[in-house]
Amino acid sequence: MSDTILTAENLKFRYDAEQPVYALDGVSVQVKRGEFVAVLGANGCGKSTLAKHFNAILLPESGKVYVEGMDTADEEKLYDIRQTVGMVFQNPDNQIVATVVEEDVAFALENLGVPPEEMRRRVDDSMKMAGIYEYRERAPHNLSGGQKQRVAIAGVVAMRPDCLILDEATAMLDPRGREQVMQTIHYLNRNMGITVVSITHYMEEAAQADRVLVMSKGHVVMEGTPKEVFSQTEKVRSLHLDVPQAAELRDELVKAGIGMPAF
C-alpha cells in the first residue's frame, strides 16, 4: 500500500469554460497517509475547489487526481473514492437529515444496507469518537453549532473513511465550538490514523497541522511545516492572511530589539 493517499498532478479547473480564469491552475500536491494538512488562502484562492476534487465532487478540466491510486475521472471508482474520502462542510445543517442524532449518524449506513448489528456498533463507536454519545437521543436542532458539526463528523466517520476533508468546517462556529470540533479531529487523526485535510481561515488551527499549504489565485504558493511557513510572516501577510499570535508576538519582540529564535 502506497504512503500517498491523495495526489493532484498539474490539476486545472474552471467553473466557466468560456472564461480565461482558472480556479485551479496547474496544482500539484500529495498528501501522505495519516498526515494532517491545513490549506490556507484568501477567499477565491481555490482551496475549496481543490477539496472538492479530492472527493470527486468536481473533476479536472485537465491533469489528474488520484485517491489511493484511483483516478477520480473513472466513474467505476466513484463509489470506492467516496468511501475512502469523507467530507464535512461549513454548515452542519446541510449535512444533517434525521430528527434524532443516532438516526442521522446511521443514515448513510442504512442506505448501504449495512447489517443491523454492525451498524449499531459503528454508530455507537463513531458517536463516542466524536464526543456526542450522550446526545444520541437528542434532536439535532436543539444542539449547539459545535455539537451539530460533531454529529456531521460522526456520520462521516461511521462510513470508515481513510481520509477526512474539512471544507471550512469550523467557519460558522464560536470559539468553544471550534475547539470542540478540532479536539475531535485531532483525536481521529492521532488515535485512529485518519488522514485529515483541513481547509481553514484560522491560523491557530493551521499551526497545529503537520504541514501547511498556502494557495493564491489557483496556485500553491507556499508549502512546509507550520514553523517553516509562519516564520515568513511578511510573505504570509502579503497573501492577505494573518499569522498565528505566537509568530506575531515574535515579530514584535524582534522589532523591539529582543533576540528570539525562529517561530
Which residues does each predicted region cover?
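Conserved ABC ATPase signature
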Residues: A139-L143, Q147
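The feature captures the beta-strand-to-loop junction immediately N-terminal to the Walker
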Residues: L40-A42
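Helix-to-loop junction immediately C-terminal to a conserved catalytic motif
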Residues: N55
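Conserved ABC ATPase "signature" region
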Residues: E117-Y135
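Catalytic Walker B motif of ABC-type/P-loop ATPase nucleotide-binding domains
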Residues: L164-D167
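Conserved ABC transporter NBD signature motif
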Residues: G63-A73, I81
